Amino acid sequence: MLAKHGRIIVLEDDIEVAPFFLRYMNSALDFYENRGVFSISGYTPELVMPRDYQFSTYVMHRNCSWGWGTWAQEWDKVDWEVKSFDSFIRNARQRSAFNECGNDLTPFLLRWKKGAREMWDIVFCYAGFVHGRPTVYPRKSLVRNAGTDGTGSHAFADAKKYSSPLAANVSLSAFVPGVAPNQELLKQFHDFYSTSTLRLIYNTLMRWRYILFGK
């Protein structure tokens, strides 16, 4: 698909979409191609937009696989073996930068390294980080994951947190042109995805276990 068309739009079977989802995705793929963007997301958590924020999209250094698209040249940047992992996991500065959009990201990558190979999207996310290329998000969500209630492959204990209402409309002429995250939105985004203190302690112990014992 990517080799033939140069781009792809992906939906899992438990994703509900707004009627104009495909129009948005194709327009965004056209607009952001060759602009330093890694992927396009159809989902967004509910964020409070700054009063002076006039755009219909925003960017973050974290991808989302709930209805998304990318280009062949970005997909080809991914190192699916994550050969830099052992140096990354020992580098506090790199971990902090990767966790800019949620302190759950490094633990997800560690879980992948330890065998959870179905978590391919964290490898894609890490590649975007390595290459400094963000994901574009809509102002309001254009997809809803119906599988977070336990019926899908990946269930969530706090499913309601991720259930954003579908947008009633979307502007295709107000895409944010830059690729630097808005700092107010970044703070909200980080807080939305970050874990509890107890989970943070557990994740830290798991990281040190890997560093010291390789498991």
Question: Language-model segments: what does each one mean?
Answer:
Residues M1-V10, I15-K215:
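An acidic/histidine-cluster motif and surrounding catalytic segment
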